[in-house]
Amino acid sequence: LLRADERERWTRILGEIAAHPDRLAQRRWQVSRAIVATWRRAGVPMMAGTDAPMPEVYPGFSLLDELERLVDAGLTPREALRTATLAPARFLGLEATSGTVAPGRRADLVLLAADPTRDIRNTRRIDAVLLGGRVLRRADLDALLQPPAMAARRTPR
């Protein structure tokens, strides 16, 4: 249960959000960009992450969105890619076996049609995935995405 002052505060905050959603979103984005820029200048390690599975946040796709936002916030595409590869391996203490492509390392790979270090949006141009020794070509990936896509179209909004 909320105290009366907490309820009043949340009523005011939610009213502001409902009245000015675009202004609030713009302000949050400005703050996020400033945080990323400050952390980058200070050398703070960053890891990409998402809130999947949450409504409207889809595993895989939400990570690609995150990488694009990190670049929009000032990271280079290479730095953004490291937030989803090497940084998590380091954080988990797996840097010796994961996080980069090298002989003897464990690796599931995403093969792209274009260089993501030139344009981070190229992470969406997936040609194939090597997963646990299996090769999944574009047609295989599209077939795997059919059931969730159909379910999403049936979900009421």
Question: What label would you give each PLM region?
Answer:
Residues L1-A73, A139, Q146-P148, R153-R157:
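Active-site neighborhoods of metal-dependent hydrolases
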Residues V129:
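Short aromatic-centered micro-motifs
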Residues A84-T85:
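Alpha-helical transmembrane segments of multi-pass membrane proteins
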Residues R121, A139-L141:
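Short, charged, surface-exposed secondary-structure boundary motifs
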